[in-house]
A protein has these predicted regions:
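N-terminal hydrophobic membrane-entry segments
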Residues: 1-205
Length: 206
């Protein structure tokens, strides 16, 4: 179905991946196949690294499992900075250059963009279900930690703190860049959107 990826695993090894809607017939006698759907060519590269077909003289392996991954956008992830962090305000036209302390909060969404990486590095051989609640706390902590380096990228655009909520696209790009190693390259997860409330400054920075 749309927004879903199926994965067949034998003896802990990925042997088939299908992210396209429609009927799928598994044939253990053929070479491994991968149908990426909307997940793109990057999934094929990951499969080439981790996927492997096991053969047992034509017999099914001792442990065969089918997993279904939700690849839809996962929304309503609230975040907020408990402590302020530094943001550099600059304007080369006026010569302005100062550090201010900011706090922010809002909502972000993410989605699984590489189910193979998510399986290998997050959920493994889970027996029943793996719910988002099991990882959302960790993702939230990492998301908040990535805000400061992402804001540092936005400061290069010479934005005022009050301008940032209106630059959601730039912020989403900066967050994905800051989270590349922990999210995209390790877990196969990407930020989809960030909606931010007005940013607050410490009183002495107003």
């Amino acid at each position: 179905a749309d927004g879903q990826c199926m994965m067949i695993v034998e003896q802990g090894k990925i042997v088939e991946v299908c992210a396209e809607p429609g009927e799928f017939t598994y044939d253990s006698s053929t070479e491994p196949s991968i149908f990426t759907g909307k997940l793109g060519e990057g999934l094929k590269k990951t499969f080439a690294t981790f996927g492997k077909r096991f053969t047992y003289g034509g017999d099914t392996g001792k442990d065969q499992r089918v997993y279904y991954f939700n690849t839809k956008e996962l929304i309503d992830n609230k975040f907020g900075t408990a402590n302020p962090f530094l943001f550099h305000v600059a304007d080369h036209n006026t010569g302005l250059s100062r550090e201010v302390q900011v706090r922010c909060n809002g909502i972000y969404s993410y989605r699984i963009t590489d189910p193979i990486l998510f399986y290998k590095n997050v959920c493994g051989n889970v027996e029943m279900t793996y719910d988002r609640e099991e990882i959302d706390g960790q993702l939230k902590t990492e998301f908040i930690s990535a805000l400061q380096p992402a804001f540092a990228q936005l400061s290069k655009l010479e934005l005022l703190p009050s301008d940032i909520p209106a630059h959601a696209g730039d912020l989403e790009e900066a967050m994905n860049e800051a989270l590349t190693k922990k999210w995209a390259e390790k877990r196969g997860i990407s930020v989809v959107s960030v909606a931010m409330n007005p940013i607050t400054l410490k009183e002495e920075d107003l």
